[in-house]
């Protein structure tokens, strides 16, 4: 059995490709069901964010498992395999383990050290368990990755003052608009990213903010979190009217198709009316054809790289400190992983000795006859079970604790030969 990850990110694919492969949370259950239906995939977890899609698997035959994931991604995105491959990365076992640790710690993010990814990894773990994709191995891996991510944030300073996608978008808006206080700002959506947008806009001096959302309750709930600021809320049918009165529009909704395009804007904007759109959603909320309109500028998550680069160099040295912590968590997972290959030998040995115990106990009880009371039988049952457990305890502890791979394998082979054990598949 081996761990592998197949994926793409802001490093390997532009947003127009990433949005085709995005798996929104409502589609996670069916995606996991389809992936686990393939013959070579035993476990699966799906991490889908605006900047990455990564599918983690446990497979007996790694090459076959990777091919099955690639086929799934091709069908899901409706992109042929040959054009998809140029954007995909594939990492096997040690590299896959290192990767999820770095992802959880924010070291692989567009915004180095950003904190939102840890919550996204946690949600991936939760959904994987909920929909029966995650079992023993990925459960342990994701728990270790979450521990790594938390340690990096509490034991290093990399998360202090880290920019996020939302703050980078506001930073870009400030560069383009110069004076946010003079701008009428509209935010489409009322989720976590929108909350961060409001937070950063307010800190940069924005005072005229409107929130447009499908649910009035969610929009009002968000506005209440910033009750000291006069934030207006609107429902979706009012969206175009509100946009027509705006200077800046930020989009952060879960829509899977563009909700703004040239035709919609042409209907409400005056000729040559300036408007800047900042789309931090994947899939994108803003169609590329809006750039054909005079005085309309649209920016997406890939346009944030220049803003993020200013922050990167100062955080790179902090990342080196974080990498040392990750090595400790990787080693802890590796020790656990290597102990897995002892499981089949230990299980087989315990099963064989338990069978002998039961057979010999049955013989003894039959000789003692029916007059031998139940209470005495329970005592003898407990006695024999205790003897077996005590005899097996030290050999099993020593076998699991043996960190030298070759020495441990020699011990297992000796046990298998001496006790004539029939063991199943070994972990590699």
Swiss-Prot record:
Signal peptide: none annotated. The active site is at 50 (nucleophile). Keywords: Chlorophyll biosynthesis, NADP, Oxidoreductase, Porphyrin biosynthesis. The keyword NADP applies. GO terms for molecular function: glutamyl-tRNA reductase activity; NADP binding. InterPro entries: 4pyrrol_synth_GluRdtase, 4pyrrol_synth_GluRdtase_dimer, 4pyrrol_synth_GluRdtase_N, GluRdtase_CS, GluRdtase_dimer_dom_sf, GluRdtase_N_sf, NAD(P)-bd_dom_sf, Shikm_DH/Glu-tRNA_Rdtase. Substrate binds at residues 49-52, 109, 114-116, 120. NADP(+) binds at residues 189-194. Catalyzes the NADPH-dependent reduction of glutamyl-tRNA(Glu) to glutamate 1-semialdehyde (GSA). This is Glutamyl-tRNA reductase.
């Amino acid at each position: 059995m081996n761990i592998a990850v197949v994926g793409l990110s802001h490093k390997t694919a532009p947003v127009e490709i990433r949005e085709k492969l995005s798996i929104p949370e409502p589609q996670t259950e069916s995606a996991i069901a389809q992936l686990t239906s393939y013959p070579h995939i035993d476990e699966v977890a799906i991490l889908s964010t605006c900047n990455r899609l990564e599918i983690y698997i446990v497979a007996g035959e790694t090459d076959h498992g990777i091919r099955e994931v690639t086929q799934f991604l091709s069908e899901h995105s409706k992109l042929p395999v040959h054009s998809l491959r140029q954007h995909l990365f594939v990492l096997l076992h040690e590299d896959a383990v290192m990767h999820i640790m770095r992802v959880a710690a924010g070291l692989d993010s567009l915004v180095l050290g950003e904190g939102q990814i840890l919550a996204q990894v946690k949600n991936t773990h939760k959904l994987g368990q909920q929909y029966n994709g995650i079992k023993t191995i990925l459960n342990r891996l994701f728990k270790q990755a979450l521990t790594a991510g938390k340690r990096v944030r509490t034991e290093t300073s990399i998360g202090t003052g880290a920019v996020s996608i939302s703050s980078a978008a506001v930073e870009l808006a400030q560069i383009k608009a110069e004076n946010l206080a003079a701008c009428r700002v509209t935010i489409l959506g009322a989720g976590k990213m929108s909350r961060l947008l409001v937070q950063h806009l307010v800190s940069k001096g924005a005072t005229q903010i409107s929130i447009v959302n499908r649910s009035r309750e969610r929009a009002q709930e968000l506005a209440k979190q910033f009750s000291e600021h006069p934030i207006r809320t609107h429902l979706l049918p009012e969206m175009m009217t509100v946009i027509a009165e705006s200077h800046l529009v930020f989009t952060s909704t879960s829509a899977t198709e563009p909700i703004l395009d040239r035709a919609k804007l042409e209907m409400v904007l005056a000729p040559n009316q300036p408007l800047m759109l900042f789309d931090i959603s994947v899939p994108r909320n803003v169609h590329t054809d809006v750039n054909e309109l005079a005085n309309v500028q649209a920016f997406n998550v890939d346009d944030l790289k220049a803003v993020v680069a200013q922050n990167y160099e100062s955080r790179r040295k902090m990342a080196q400190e974080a990498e040392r912590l990750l090595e400790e968590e990787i080693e802890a997972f590796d020790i656990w992983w290597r102990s897995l290959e002892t499981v089949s030998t230990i299980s087989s040995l315990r099963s064989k000795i338990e069978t002998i115990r039961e057979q010999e106990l049955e013989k003894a009880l039959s000789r003692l006859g029916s007059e031998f009371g139940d209470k005495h039988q329970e005592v003898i049952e407990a006695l024999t079970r205790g003897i077996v457990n005590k005899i097996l305890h030290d050999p099993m502890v020593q076998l699991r604790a043996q960190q030298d791979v070759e020495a441990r394998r020699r011990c297992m082979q000796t046990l298998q030969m001496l006790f004539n054990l029939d063991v199943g598949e070994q972990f590699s």
